[in-house]
């Protein structure tokens, strides 16, 4: 049964890929609108749609463009679903002003996609996706130094796997080594080298504490991180070099945060969350390789430990390789794993995810602003039914055909 539905959708996808006619190559740059007082507004983004077929049930985030790990319970029979998803679709407004303090100029960014609050059940609600804010920040920059205040990615977010289906929820995100989240805060970026062969950038960030709400704070929506009265802190050092035949980058980032596990109004100790992540990429000719590794404690709010909160320790990593057959045809392979340490993780719930592995592959066609991809994702998740119970494994598979137009 599984081979039948996989083969059917794969053949259909390859026929559609083969039928695409060539288009003139062009690089998306966004639409620039000139405003008063020397300001400009750049409108950019993309339309993204995915048609997918799943065998087995994914858990946590969802079944479509946000599928990441296998659910603990699976259908005994009739496992196949066919569905569509357009919530990756994104729009970005970037405002740029003239210098106001010496060489420092203001810039403001507002970005949104359609992974907002769920708008109801089928047959109609699931076709009415709602907007959500991704970024909302204001910069003051002279090119070398940028002060950013507002909502943006924590430095821990790092590298991002290439995909046409899993964009807002990247491959392995909160499931197989890909961590990080966006928060309101203060971010400082400074290029330590200028005009050198290797660019070195320092990033410092202090942003909103985060964590699940407990006790009376559930009603007020105050999480454990906010209740601690302390920010999350991160520092990143990035190295990169670009050349016609070889480009590479490498980074290391450290993280610390605090959570008041008893919430406001109740005396108690804070839980300290820590993490270290290293990652990078290398692009020799037509090949590309990228990935990252993290190890940490109590960073579920950053999508660590297979997105499990509390006093949990563990590590995760992912690696993706790609090859450009031609300027238009490329292939990618992905593997990621996240492995909480059961013996050192008292915060794991009775029914817990103790390991997850994601394997994915994509064949991609690009012609200017247009891209089409056929992807396969398989999640293998190890569950623990109770504390000290015998673990068991579940799996779920997704075949997806995705299209994107970038503007």
Regions found by a protein language model. Give the residues of each.
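Detector for outer-membrane/organellar transmembrane beta-barrel domains
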Residues: 235, 239-358, 365
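Bacterial N-terminal signal peptides that target proteins for export
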Residues: 1-10
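Outer-membrane beta-barrel "beta-signal"
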Residues: 365-368, 393-407
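C-terminal closing repeat unit and adjoining cap/tail of repeat-based domains
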Residues: 362-376
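Outer membrane beta-barrel
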Residues: 28-63, 69, 73-212, 229-234, ...
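C-terminal segment of classical bacterial N-terminal signal peptides
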Residues: 14-23
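Sequence/structural signature of outer-membrane beta-barrel proteins
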Residues: 54, 98-100, 115-121, 152-158, ...
